[in-house]
Design a protein with these regions (language model features):
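Active-site glycine-centered loops adjacent to acidic/histidine catalytic or metal-binding residues
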Residues: 11, 108, 226
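Short internal beta-strands
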Residues: 52-56, 134-135, 296
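Conserved donor-nucleotide/metal-binding helix-loop-beta segment in metal-dependent transferases, i.e.
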Residues: 114-143
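Catalytic-core segments of class I nucleotidyltransferases/pyrophosphorylases
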Residues: 103, 120, 124, 155-242
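Conserved N-terminal catalytic core of the sugar/cofactor nucleotidyltransferase
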Residues: 1-7, 15, 28-29, 33-107, ...
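A structural signal for short hydrophobic beta-strand segments in well-ordered beta-sheet cores
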Residues: 27, 148-151, 215
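Structural signal for interior beta-strand "rungs" in well-ordered beta-sheet cores
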Residues: 248-317
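Short alpha-helical oligomerization interface
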Residues: 21-25
Length: 317
């Protein structure tokens, strides 16, 4: 079992557009919790007890949410990446707090706790492992936007970030198990053609030094990169948990069709129909007679009286 995890959360989520204008990607809500907390829930279920979060230079929202450790079991340490110069520099910010074997995950990458447990077990099964990678079946185009791997039996013989010509049927996704030895390779990692220092280069350098790198395969993950992903991930958690969670007072004439999550501090007008597969965040308001299904309504958003919305992220203007 691995007890420590580093979470990379410094990215602003540019491809999410207006959704990240007033908060970082790590704080986007998934059925009542930030995606950061959802990720921590899965890691904690696999045995993680301490988290080191690498936040952006001016990002205080993570500290505000986790500052008292009341929202998640285990200790939360927050450090800041001053410049967005890649995963290597982000991990270097966390390095002083790493005490032994650890997991590394991006904040936008959700996998099952069973896979996390399997990844940790495969890493720990070989004492000479410097790393174990999470692999996901992928198309060549998907691999071009991720990392390609060369598999040799039960180990990784090579890794390349964003390859022009992928050789594998698997992409390495941003969930790794590492020994502290991997940290020794970080300072020498060069800047890539993309202008960043990338963790795949450190892994490749360790392989070239003769270090052992293992892997575990998963066929499932949720990845938040676009607004359609935020909708899909919310619907996954709503359907997984089922029924409904209503934390605001609603008029008697409101119809709720589960699964639905309504946070505290939501205003819902009379004669509205909410659901199925709908999440209303604190600070949102639904006009009288509105009908919502398969929607996420974010804080500050207003749905006009009588409006009908389906399959949408509804954000403030």
């Amino acid at each position: 079992m691995i007890h420590q995890a580093v979470i990379l959360a410094a990215g602003r989520g540019v491809r999410l557009g207006a959704l990240t204008q007033d908060r970082p990607k790590s704080m986007l809500p998934i059925a009542g919790k930030p995606i950061m907390a959802r990720l921590m829930d899965g890691l904690r279920a696999a045995g993680v007890q301490e988290f080191v979060v690498v936040a952006g230079a001016d990002d205080h929202s993570v500290a505000e949410y986790f500052g008292n450790n009341g929202h998640v079991g285990g200790q939360v340490i927050i450090v800041h990446q001053l410049r967005p110069t890649g995963t290597v520099d982000a991990l270097l910010q966390a390095a002083p707090h790493i005490t032994g074997p650890f997991l590394l995950s991006s904040v936008d990458n959700l996998t099952s706790s069973d896979h996390v447990t399997n990844l940790a077990a495969r890493f720990l099964a070989h004492p000479d492992n410097v790393a174990a990678l999470s692999l996901l079946p992928a198309t060549p185009d998907q691999i071009r936007h991720s990392a390609d791997v060369h598999i040799d039996g039960d180990r990784i013989a090579g890794i390349e970030e964003k390859p022009a010509a992928p050789r594998s049927i698997y992409a390495a996704i941003m969930l790794y198990a590492f020994s502290r030895q991997l940290l020794d390779y970080l300072p020498a990692v060069p800047v890539s053609p993309r202008g960043e220092r990338e963790i795949a280069s450190a892994i490749q350098a360790s392989i070239e030094d003769g270090c052992r790198v293992g892997y575990a395969i998963t066929d499932w993950r949720l990845h938040l990169t676009r607004d359609s992903d935020l909708l899909a991930i919310n619907q996954y958690y709503l359907q997984r948990d089922g029924e409904h969670s209503i934390l605001s007072t609603l008029p008697d004439t409101v119809t709720v069709v589960p699964p639905v999550r309504i946070d505290p501090g939501v205003v819902v007008g009379p004669d509205s129909v909410v659901g199925p597969n709908t999440y209303l965040e604190t600070g949102s308001a639904i006009g009288a007679g509105a009908r919502l299904r398969d929607c996420v309504v974010l804080r500050g958003a207003r749905v006009a009286p009588g409006a009908e919305r389906s399959g949408q992220i509804i954000a403030s203007a």
